[in-house]
């Protein structure tokens, strides 16, 4: 098993401000990790926290969710934080389901909202 040194950050369009705020709030902790993120989410997180090591994948609908899913399957990701907008239908919903399935299959902690992410992040190193 590979050492899980990455935290994955993904946010639906209406949740990107919340993800940037989350990253700012937890910046000191996140600086210890390589952050992998889908394209626009990664740009927003990097703009909010320039000191973070953010590796940007493609946009979610263009395959970014699947790129992060591959990292989960390689057991490189310690935690998936995915701020989901439950009120907006997503055209690439099947990609999102596949990503979540991989996180479940590989027993990767997954937070789908801010409250869960705030509580899980501090214990990820235990």
UniProtKB/Swiss-Prot annotation:
Kindly list the GO molecular function terms attached to this UniProt entry.
methylglyoxal synthase activity
Record-annotated MGS-like domain positions: 1-126
Q: Which SUPFAM superfamilies match?
A: Methylglyoxal synthase-like
- What single Pfam family name could you report for this chain, choosing any that match? MGS
The EC designation for this entry is 4.2.3.3
One cellular component (GO) term of this entry: cytosol
Which transformation does this protein catalyse, written as a reaction? dihydroxyacetone phosphate = methylglyoxal + phosphate
Instruction: Enumerate the residues binding substrate.
Output: 12, 16, 38-41, 59-60, 92
**Record bears the keyword Lyase:** yes
Q: In the UniProt entry, which residues are flagged as the active site? A: 65
InterPro entries of this UniProt entry? Methylgl_synth, Methylglyoxal_synth_AS, MGS-like_dom, MGS-like_dom_sf
Q: Which SMART domains match?
A: MGS
Q: Name one GO biological process term.
A: methylglyoxal biosynthetic process
Membrane-spanning intervals of the chain: none
Q: Which UniProt keywords apply?
A: Lyase
Q: Which family does it belong to?
A: Belongs to the methylglyoxal synthase family.
State the NCBIfam families in the record: MGSA, PRK05234.1
Query: Which HAMAP family would you find in this protein's record?
Result: Methylglyoxal_synth (MF_00549)
The role this protein plays is: Catalyzes the formation of methylglyoxal from dihydroxyacetone phosphate.
Q: What is this protein called?
A: Methylglyoxal synthase
